[in-house]
Structures are given as C-alpha cells and as structure tokens.
Amino acid sequence: AAHRHKKPNALSGGQRQRVALARTLMEGRPIVLLDEPFSALDAKIRAEMQELAAGLFAGKTVCLITHDPGEAARLGDVIFVMNATGLHSITPPSSPVIRPYDAPDVLACQGQLLRLLRETP
C-alpha cells in the first residue's frame, strides 16, 4: 500500500515481481503460465508468495517455469526437466502441494532433479 503511487521504474525488482504476480492472480484465468515468478524475491517473501499463489491457483492449470529444483519439488504436481539430453518426466512427491521444504520426499525429489540437471551427454 505504501508504494501504490510509485511508477513501476521506482519499484525494486522484487516489488515489480509481486505486482506482476498480483496482476496474474487478478485475471482469474483457468490456465496460467508463470515464468520464474518468484526469482527476484528474497527467501522469506518467496516462500510466502509461493504459499499465496498455491492457494489462489488451486483448481487451475498452472505451467510454472523455474530454475529452482526445490521450488519444483515443493510446488509441482507434474514435473518436467529439460537438459542437454532432452525432456524428462520426474515423479513429484506424493504429498499435497504446498510441500514443506524439509520433507524427506521433497528433498529426495530435489536431489533427483539436481542430478538430472547436472547430467552431460
């Protein structure tokens, strides 16, 4: 609220990221494409925004592009990884979204994603 009169170029990267996410949330579309929506946020705000988005996007089809394996493991119902060898489907943790960062199945999935990302042909 304190920034509502500011022009976009006067906002920080994280503030602009939050405005973009808020605009997307307000549109109410059944299909949503999010390209690195949490990338410019600090860890605390990132976790809060992930939780907010997960709740507000429940029941919608969401394609989330991320370079963060932990984020994919925490938020993904279906996970694909693209690396030098192609496109790979990964089984996500079986617990419901939004998963705790430190849950064993989330950590195992994150490890699997990191190993796959590090593969070289």
Regions found by a protein language model. Name each.
Residues 6, 27-28:
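Conserved signature/switch motifs of ABC ATPase nucleotide-binding domains
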Residues 7-11, 15:
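Conserved ABC ATPase signature
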Residues 21:
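Hydrophobic anchor residue at the start of the ABC signature
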Residues 32-36:
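Catalytic Walker B motif of ABC-type/P-loop ATPase nucleotide-binding domains
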Residues 43-45:
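Helix N-cap at the start of a conserved alpha-helix in ABC-type nucleotide-binding domains
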Residues 48-64:
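Conserved catalytic loops of ABC-family nucleotide-binding domains
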Residues 74-81:
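Conserved catalytic segment of ABC-fold P-loop ATPases
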Residues 84-114:
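Conserved beta-strand-loop-alpha-helix hinge in the C-terminal portion
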